[in-house]
Amino acid sequence: MRTNERAPFRQAVSFDASRFTPHGMMRLFGIETEYGITRDDLEQVDPVVESMELVRAHLTASFERRWDYAGEDPHEDARGFRVSGLQQDKEEDEFAKVDAHRPFSFHEMKSDLVLPNGARFYNDHTHPEYSTPECRTLKDLLAHDRAGERIVQRAAERRNRALGGPHVQLYKNNTDFHGHSYGCHDNYLVPRAIPFSSLMTGLLPFLVSRQVIAGAGKMGVEAQESGFVPGRYQLSQRADFMETDMSVDTMHNRPILNTRDEPHADRTKYRRLHLIIGDANMCEYATALKIGTTQLVLQLIARQAAPAIELDHPVTAVKQVSRDQDLKATVRRKNGRSITGLEIQEQYYTAAEKHLAGSDPETDWILREWKATLQWLTRDRGQLVGWLDWVTKLWLLETFVREERLGWDDPWLASLDLEYHNVNPEQGLYLGLEADGKVWRMTTDADVDAAMAEGPRDTRGGLRGLCVRRFPDQIKSMQWERIQFSGGLLPRTLEMGDLFEPSEVKACAAAFETAASPMDALKAWNNGKESQS
């Protein structure tokens, strides 16, 4: 098992990140995680109700409707057009017919909460979803991702106390092994000046191969034509469910590159890159590599320096890479040549090292760890047990198969796969390894506790959480990019569609920390901006 022979992560990234990296790329990212939910005391489980009850178990007071859905429009396509309908619209209509007979309103079922740390926690119809606040550094993002695990698990514990037993279990994974997949989406703020065609060309090969370092591992294959096929281990939990190169859909016809155009920011300046191909990681190191390497690739695209790799059939390729744990499967390029997923990653690393080395400490940490990980995957992947999820899970399963003398098609292995992702510390296999010191943590308990309490102080996520803590009764509505307050003759709004400069965020937060009311804070903030203009 690999030892931590290099500089600790916490030292390597303890710096003030600037607003922009070279060539206008802003560091701002976040993760949305849909959790699998089960309840073992019922023969038939209504996941809509269970997800709603779980989210509401987080509350210590009655639910108040605050989230404003007016700005959410999944039909806008980043390729420059608006689709008239999505494949998932029909399913949503069917859900609406069923929901009409439930004893809850739409807003009660969604139970949409904005938490004191700036995160969003809500019922995404059949799954509880936790969205981190916007983060500027990997250190903050890892802490907030782990904070999400603890927050949803504490909600489950409260729910179980009400039920009289440990009946509700939550899983940070991406499949129920019955053909249903749920997502872990990574999001990045990108300048709209970068053409979407450039993002498409530069990202597709990278995303096809990213599972080599960021896959969560999966026992079995879920193919639409044959259902669940046991006995085969693969790198990614999501690969089986990818159906097209690009699409605005997310639930059906799932794309490698999602084209939904909901920037949650000033539309004239920014776009939000919404990636749905990623697995839900338990290993903090894998999460750091997943987000960190993607951020570097976006910088390469901004510089027009991404490797020129065009795959013949990306959807086929993502499955081929996933279903070969030896990393030797080749995929076809449009030039007729073949390439492995590992080789694709090596080409992206080489380009990033050439163009980005020395940019800042976090970039150098990502480059160093990216290189080391690719080398270990080539030489001795066993050194990555406790660092990468797919390697760690495979090691656990191999150990179990050997000790219990099982065949690889034994259904017990799929159950172990599931329990690897259980966020209950008393049952989760990964959390058991963590408690035994067998995985490398990049956060401390103090980091996670702090992230549960408040958001990053240099992003609007932290400002959002501050408003929730200071003025909960005066918030009329919220979206990612704005907060509307009540209490005056007319509602007043804090616009955050272009509030990304750390110094501006901190100045705005200072106004809200000291003001007696939101109106006073907005007045002080606006006066401060005018005096500087």
Label each residue range with its predicted role:
Residues 2-166, 170-171, 204-216, 246-257, ...:
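Terminal catalytic/cofactor-binding subdomain
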Residues 157, 166-244:
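Internal, well-ordered domain-core segments that constitute the primary functional module
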